[in-house]
UniProtKB/Swiss-Prot annotation:
GO biological process: anthocyanin-containing compound biosynthetic process
Keyword vocabulary terms for this entry: Glycosyltransferase, Transferase
Transmembrane segments: none
Protein name: Anthocyanidin-3-O-glucoside rhamnosyltransferase
Keyword Endoplasmic reticulum: no
UniProt similarity note: Belongs to the UDP-glycosyltransferase family.
Pathway where it operates: Pigment biosynthesis; anthocyanin biosynthesis
Signal peptide, first to last residue: none
Origin species: Petunia hybrida (Petunia)
Length: 473
């Protein structure tokens, strides 16, 4: 089947254009690799400063090419900063300003390349109109779960132009929202969601960017499946009156290379499935109080743990740890606890037989990695779509547990950490722990089913081929 697809779709040409954040670039790369295996020609747009890293992530294929983009000068944007990884959240907003100034450059490239489709991201609200004028179809590729789009950015959220919702409005789902486990959100979560309606540097709000993109595109592509999010997918389809193509949740390839020896040696000391691995992504910095309560909560489980903490650039990590961690903590846990700052081989660690639990920020890719590696998922979401990921996984999928937090400000204590971990690691013979562990195994089996994965990509290629009216003869 795949060989037939390869032969028949040689002519299909797709431009992929993610926002300049690796949390967005990575899903675009994963999809590019899948499409190239079906013989689809891919031109990958990214800032020149990101090109070498993107190249290392893309599979080598004669039909895949990187197109480096030149970022214009923007007051306040440091020279050479071409992804959110090098910027604070406030300065990262300037990347959207830069992107908006790149429209002439993008139009020239698209006029020259003449692809059948552009797969674009949330920030390029102007792209559908531009591409349409050039006779090019556009697909809005949503890298967040469908629940996030359904709850936050559907037209039903703003029923009158520019009359944005209040804090109380954001606690409730929008009009017509399907009946699911998500019936409300907490005050601190709703407050975080209000970011969607803020304007930065006199630019469009995130909500308005997403609306323009979704309303203007030819079709919507979602990194999800009906088994996980059926009601939300139907709601999004009805709200925008557009076809929604699905590619299923993207399961990462098994890690290449061996786990660093010092970590492998340490993990090998413990019984299978007993170690807690804990990390919150590269762009999350916990407060001193959060570090303290998290560390004490992990200690109180009595289980071995590997805690990865991130700190802003140019700070003294040792000094930060000494200030944030309780006095005597490192000495107390030296035999069964590791506190590390910096990059680690996360996939390799989750795949290690000793690791049985992942305490995380509920980034959906991280959750998928945990589920397929037989790790129980304990979630402490930090912002935005992570909050809704956690509700999907703990509520609709019943495949993880969310750490309890105070409604007003999101405070959590060591007891909340301990209680959540023990549900899935200690009290495993009674619900909810028993049910969650059973569901983890079911979702693992589903996610690793290669026939299902291939079917989604094959269907997408067929749909795009039909839309583009590419000759398959």
């Amino acid at each position: 089947m795949e060989n037939e697809m390869k032969h028949s779709n040689d002519a299909l040409h797709v431009v992929m254009f993610p926002f300049f954040a690796f949390g967005h670039i990575s899903p675009f790369v994963q999809l590019a690799n899948k499409l190239s295996s079906y013989g689809v020609k891919v031109s990958f747009f990214t800032a020149s400063g990101n090109a070498s890293r993107v190249k290392s992530m893309l599979n080598s294929a004669p039909t895949t090419h990187i197109v480096p983009l030149t970022l214009p000068h923007v007051e306040g944007l440091p020279p050479g900063a071409e992804s959110t990884a090098e910027l604070t959240p406030a300065s990262a907003e300037l990347l959207k300003v830069a992107l908006d100034l790149m429209q002439p450059q993008i139009k020239t490239l698209l006029s020259h390349l003449k692809p059948h489709f552009v797969l674009f991201d949330f920030a390029q609200e102007w792209l559908p109109k531009m591409a349409n004028g050039l006779g090019i179809k556009t697909v809005y590729y949503s890298v967040v779960v469908a629940l996030s789009t359904a709850f936050l950015t559907c037209p039903a959220r703003v029923l009158e132009p520019k009359k944005y919702p209040s804090l109380e409005d954001m606690k409730k789902p929008p009009l017509g929202f399907p009946q699911t486990s998500v019936t409300s959100v907490r005050t601190f979560e709703a407050r975080d969601f209000l970011y969607v309606f803020k304007s930065f540097h006199n630019g469009p709000t995130l909500y308005d960017r997403i609306q323009s993109g979704l309303r203007g595109c030819s079709a919507i592509l979602a990194k999800t499946c009906s088994q996980m999010e059926g009601p939300y997918i139907k709601y999004v389809e009805a709200q925008f009156n557009k076809p929604v193509f699905l590619i299923g949740p993207v399961v990462p390839d098994p890690p290449s290379g061996k786990l660093e020896e010092k970590w492998a040696t340490w993990l090998n000391k413990f019984e299978g499935g007993t170690v807690i691995y804990c990390s919150f992504g590269s762009e999350t910095f916990l407060t001193d109080d959060q570090v303290k309560e998290l560390a004490l909560g992990l200690e109180q489980t009595g289980l071995p743990f590997f805690l990865v903490l991130n700190f802003p650039a140019n700070v003294d990590v040792s000094a930060e740890l000494n200030r944030a961690l309780p006095e005597g903590f490192l000495e107390r846990v030296k035999d069964k606890g590791i506190i590390h700052s910096g990059w680690v081989q996360q996939q390799n660690i989750l795949a290690h037989s000793s690791v049985g639990c992942y305490v995380c920020h509920a980034g959906f890719s991280s959750v998928i990695e945990a589920l397929v590696n037989d790790c129980q998922v304990v979630m402490l979401p930090q912002k935005g779509d992570q909050i809704l990921n956690a509700k999907l996984v703990s509520g609709d999928m019943e495949a993880g547990v969310e750490i309890n937090r105070r409604d007003e400000d999101g405070y959590f204590g060591k007891e909340d950490i301990k209680e959540a971990v023990e549900k899935v690691m200690v009290d495993v013979e009674k619900d909810p722990g028993k049910l969650i562990r059973e569901n983890q195994k079911k979702w693992k089996e589903f996610l690793l089913n290669k026939d299902i994965q291939s079917k989604y990509i094959g269907n997408l290629v067929n749909e795009m081929t039909a839309m583009a009216k590419v000759s398959t003869t």
